[in-house]
């Protein structure tokens, strides 16, 4: 877990602004911080980095890393899974002075140029300054596991690992009415480059951005559709199955190979599949700790650490979300996940693993998830003005198969990018690093490619890799947590925030009477649309923190 920030341009007191930006990311790492400032074209460039050392095998090197011999400056947030293999390949051409992945990145760039990113297996957000060419490169991993945000103001470029770091530089903080309106009406999180904040963009997954001091240009160094076509054209079913099995084994080693203890959440199919793969391929005894979300009335199992979620925790976590969420949150699931991260940290863990990515392999998470661009809720809560701001999401269809098209949209545009952003910020706030080993390589592309050359459908061939007992990996039905959490303090918190929304700067977007009626119904234990209530609370949390 790391945080990177940067400024390029003619900025007054650049060093102080850079320090303020980094200070806003101090929760992402407390193992020291590094600053680097230099001239750039006709202005200046500055980068800073803070981090939390997770790996127990890799050398800790202060960043931004300055490679004087290659004239490259690098700052990275992420994990390079194959850095040892890349280092071995590069040793014939370069002399290494550290045993760190960041130096490998520097040498890899000098050897292969922009083509180096395609050789990397891992999750990363990278800022790399080529001093010979006077160009700044910014790159993001294949599926956008690691975040990267940027904005321009008065001809200057600002970038960072979280949106709050941009505001830390003194830039204006304003929500995007258009983006929030589209979320309220259509449930869309927006295109891959957009955010819920005015004038703030994110670098899309698999993208590479260049800045030469005068203009920004962007291209894709990775395209999943191109990789699927390449896999299908070059390999038959037997070869693809072998590649899939190898990728699953590799993913297991990414979980725990460089840490002494690692946490896993159980209760969902993807996480349980991780444990099955670990048992199948072996792991060091004592490395693994498992969690299960529960409430205070559940007896602790001997081999599972319960995640206590008491009514008092709910309000506490909701209050904290105001400072870290930066976009809509998902109610119960976000609260439980954040409590897991916090408890893992108290247990002394640096790393918690998730099975995100395996969902794509099974497909069930994305079954029937295509967006029909219609109102998702009765819109009597909203004023006609909201519909004028909201734009219907529209995505291209390059897949012949409709299921693949829907999966691709959720993978690259909607659900998965949102989940990854929430994972990143909530884990950073809690002080742990989340590993998503199934999104660092080629597993997702293989899950698309194999059905194209096989007589079996996706679920049929995936059954081969499931635990012997199918029942052991089925999601467990649980009673809703709302009745257990329905404390007076939670009702008061919700009533206060809905009232603030009805009186605030965006009240004209709502029918205020309907908004207050929803709040009253909730507090009086009457049925309400909880998803819609969470949307309104998410919006107010961001407004209330302005």
Predicted regions and their residues:
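Conserved glycosyltransferase catalytic-site signature
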Residues: 101-102, 121-123, 177, 333-338, ...
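Short acidic/histidine-rich active-site segments
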Residues: 349-365
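ATP-dependent adenylate-handling ligase core
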Residues: 295-346, 362-375, 449-453
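Cysteine-centered catalytic environments shared across enzyme families
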Residues: 1-326, 337, 537
């Amino acid at each position: 877990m790391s945080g990177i920030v940067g400024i390029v341009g003619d900025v007054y007191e650049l060093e102080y602004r850079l320090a303020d930006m980094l200070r806003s990311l101090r929760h992402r790492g407390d193992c020291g911080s590094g600053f680097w400032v230099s001239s750039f074209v006709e202005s200046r460039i500055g980068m800073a980095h803070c981090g939390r050392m997770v790996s127990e095998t890799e050398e800790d090197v202060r960043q931004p890393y300055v490679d004087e011999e290659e004239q490259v400056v690098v700052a990275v947030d992420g994990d390079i899974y194959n850095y040892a293999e890349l280092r071995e390949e590069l040793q014939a051409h370069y002399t290494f002075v550290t045993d760190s992945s960041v130096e490998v990145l520097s040498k890899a760039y000098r050897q292969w140029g922009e083509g180096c990113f395609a050789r990397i297996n891992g999750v990363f957000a990278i800022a790399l300054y080529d001093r010979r060419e006077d160009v700044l490169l910014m790159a993001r991993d294949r599926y956008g596991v690691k975040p990267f945000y940027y904005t321009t103001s008065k001809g200057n470029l600002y970038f960072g690992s979280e949106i709050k770091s941009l505001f830390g530089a003194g830039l204006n903080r304003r929500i995007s009415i258009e983006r929030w309106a589209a979320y309220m009406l259509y449930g869309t999180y927006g295109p891959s480059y957009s955010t819920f904040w005015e004038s703030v963009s994110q670098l899309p997954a698999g993208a590479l951005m260049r800045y030469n001091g005068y203009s920004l240009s962007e291209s894709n160094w990775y395209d999943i559709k191109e990789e699927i076509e390449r896999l299908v054209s070059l390999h038959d079913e037997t070869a693809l199955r072998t590649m899939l099995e190898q990728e699953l084994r590799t993913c297991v080693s990414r979980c725990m190979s460089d840490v002494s203890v690692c946490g896993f959440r159980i209760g969902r199919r993807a996480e349980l599949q991780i444990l099955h793969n670990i048992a199948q391929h072996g792991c060091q005894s004592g490395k693994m700790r498992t969690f299960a979300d529960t409430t205070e009335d559940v007896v602790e199992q001997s081999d599972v650490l319960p995640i206590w979620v008491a009514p008092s925790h709910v309000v506490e976590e909701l209050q904290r979300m105001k400072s870290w969420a930066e976009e809509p949150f998902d109610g119960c699931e976000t609260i439980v996940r954040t409590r897991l991260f916090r408890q893992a940290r108290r247990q002394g863990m640096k790393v918690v693993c998730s099975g995100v990515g395996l969902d794509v392999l099974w497909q069930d998470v994305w079954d029937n998830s295509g967006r029909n661009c219609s109102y998702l809720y009765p819109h009597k809560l909203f004023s006609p003005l909201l519909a004028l701001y909201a734009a219907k999401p529209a995505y291209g269809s390059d897949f012949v198969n409709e299921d693949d098209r829907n999966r691709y949209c959720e993978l690259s545009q909607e659900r998965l990018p949102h989940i990854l952003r929430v994972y990143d910020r909530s884990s950073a706030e809690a002080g742990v690093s989340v590993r998503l080993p199934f999104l660092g390589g080629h597993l997702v592309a293989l899950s698309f490619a194999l059905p194209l050359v096989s007589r079996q459908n996706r679920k049929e061939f995936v059954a081969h890799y499931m635990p012997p007992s199918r029942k052991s990996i089925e999601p467990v039905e649980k009673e809703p947590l709302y009745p257990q959490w329905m404390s007076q303090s939670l009702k008061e918190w919700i009533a206060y925030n809905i009232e603030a929304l009805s009186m605030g700067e965006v009240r004209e977007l709502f029918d205020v009477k309907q908004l207050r009626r929803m709040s009253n119904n909730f507090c009086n234990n009457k049925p309400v649309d909880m998803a819609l209530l969470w949307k309104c609370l998410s919006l107010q949390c961001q407004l209330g923190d302005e």
